[in-house]
A protein has these predicted regions:
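Conserved AMP-binding/adenylate-forming core of the ANL superfamily
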Residues: 31-35, 55-93, 98, 107, ...
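Conserved AMP-binding/adenylate-forming
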Residues: 68-71, 84-134, 251-259
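Gly/Ser/Thr-rich phosphate-binding loop
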Residues: 180-182, 188-196, 298, 310-389, ...
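Conserved ATP-binding/catalytic segment of the ANL
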Residues: 392-462
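Conserved pre-ATP/AMP-binding loop-to-beta segment of ANL
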Residues: 36, 51-54, 178, 183, ...
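Short beta-strand->loop structural element characteristic of the AMP-binding/adenylate-forming
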Residues: 101-103, 110, 114, 118-154, ...
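AMP-binding/adenylate-forming
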Residues: 123, 142-151, 210-214, 221-309
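Structural core segment of the AMP-binding/adenylate-forming
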Residues: 2, 122-193, 291-322, 459-462
Length: 462
């Protein structure tokens, strides 16, 4: 599978499914384009080979804030529910590639819905469940949503009722469906939709995966589109640093509402053939209990939680901690010194920086992939150029290229061509001191920014 081959090119990591020889990628040029692969094909491949492997785990406190049971889904069960839901979506007779909004909190339903929309041949549009009616309306209009999948209850909030108000103001929204209980009148009950739907293999050709839409900075006026292959590539690049093995667990505190949450959570778990456990609503006691559950675990958390985690007695089975930053960001000074007082162990920490919705860059502290080193000298980036490459302009701003950062803006719902080999400019530049990056800052573009100063060249091997 292309994602695993991309990982093996850079580091010999475990794969999502068995049967791919370790030597398969040796001698493969670094700039070979990655073959097309989708999140759904990764789910199906693992479901066929390891049907009893755990795919998604709901948080134990889920009934308290949703009135829905906490379920542990095997890969086989998840694949069946995804196909049932996808068949139901196809029965709506929407044109292929229609935009379907997902306004869900990040529990198992969110993961299954993302996969089902892809399997139905439509575009999943990630709508943060925290958005109010006005922002949801703006997103629906800007993306030209045809349908939305949501949830009846989230704590004291009622997302389905909020979206009913949006549907009354935006007539292009043809279908509104929600997971229950207590689904409002006029809203399709997704639980019934799934249970009453047909099971088994899909009839006829499976529609092509159509990608997804997210929003830059959580702004409904700034939708961007990326293909499913680009999401898989972003997850593959992240896993080079995080090194998640099949059957291990990713415990994520970041919802799949944007690139940073999706690529480090659901997509990473599917690429690695691992388990994903999420915590849509953070609770300290529930988090402590989840962290101490048996089994090798990789934690994905917002970077601001580093101080809290540093003071904890962390379980021995915690293999790594991915601290996810949003640019602009500052690297904590103590993160550069291994074994500092009250600090996390450097070799288990991965810094991940989200450059808007353009790209993710991940590196393990205390190694040659430490982001303070890589962003200090871009030629230290060792990922395959087909996956991601990096340059800095004369004004210091970073630009990305490669399948992991192939993204394009939507203009009133019209999707432009996704640039294959074009550089994706960002407004962010590293702050350098003695050859190290100490922060990422936002800078105004200068007139001479077009000429690159430093390239991260393609790596031909290890």
């Amino acid at each position: 599978m292309s994602a695993q081959r991309a990982i093996m090119q850079a580091e010999a990591l475990p794969r999502a499914s068995d049967g791919i020889p370790q030597d398969a990628s040796r001698g493969m040029p670094a700039d070979v384009p990655l073959r097309r692969i989708s999140l759904g094909s990764l789910l199906s491949a693992t479901a066929r080979r390891h049907p009893e492997r755990i795919a998604v785990v709901d948080p134990a406190d889920k009934p308290d804030w949703s009135d829905r049971p906490a379920i542990t889904w095997t890969y086989a069960a998840a694949a069946e529910i995804v196909e049932r839901l996808a068949r139901g979506l196809r029965s709506w007779r929407l044109p292929p590639g229609s935009r379907i909004g997902l306004c869900l909190p990040g529990s198992a339903e969110s993961a299954l819905a993302i996969l089902a929309v892809e399997a139905a041949g439509h575009v999943a549009c990630l709508l943060p469940v925290s958005w109010d009616e006005e922002r949801l309306l703006a997103a629906a209009q800007n993306v030209a949503l045809s349908a939305v999948l949501t949830q009846a209850r989230l704590g004291s909030a009622r997302p389905a009722e909020r979206l009913c108000a949006v549907a009354a103001r935006y007539f292009g929204l043809r279908y509104l469906a929600a997971f229950g209980p207590d689904v409002p009148d006029g809203v399709i009950n997704l639980d019934r939709f799934v249970l009453d739907g047909p099971a088994g293999e899909p009839a006829g050709p499976v529609p092509a995966a159509a990608g997804l839409v997210s929003f830059v900075g959580g702004d409904p006026e700034r939708p961007v589109y990326r293909s499913g292959e680009a999401v898989v590539a972003a997850a593959a690049a992240h896993l080079v640093a995080m090194r998640v093995a099949p059957t291990e667990r990713i415990l994520s505190l970041i919802g799949p509402h944007d690139l940073r949450g999706l690529a480090t959570g659901l997509a990473a778990a599917l690429v690695a053939g691992a388990t994903l456990e999420t915590m849509p609503l953070f609770d300290g006691a529930a988090f402590a209990a989840a962290l101490r559950r048996p089994g090798p675990t990789h934690l994905v958390a917002p970077a601001f939680l580093e101080k809290n985690l540093a003071g904890r007695d962390l379980p021995a089975e915690l293999r790594s901690i991915a601290l996810v930053h949003r640019a602009p960001a500052r690297f904590p000074g103590r993160s550069r010194a291994a074994g500092g007082p009250q600090g996390l162990r450097a070799d288990m920490v991965i810094d991940t920086i989200a450059f808007g919705e353009t790209a993710l860059l991940s590196g393990r502290r205390g190694t040659t992939s430490d982001l303070s080193l890589v962003l200090g000298k871009l030629e230290r980036l060792t990922l395959p150029a087909s996956l991601i490459s990096l340059r800095r302009g004369l004004d210091g701003r970073l630009a990305f290229r490669g399948q992991a950062c192939a993204v394009t803006a939507l203009q009133r719902g019209n999707q432009g061509a996704v640039p294959g080999n074009a550089w994706q400019e960002t407004p962010y530049a590293p702050v350098l001191f003695a050859g190290f990056a100490t922060a990422i800052e936002e800078v105004e573009p200068s007139g001479s920014a077009g000429s690159p100063e430093i390239f991260a060249p393609a790596q031909s091997g290890r």
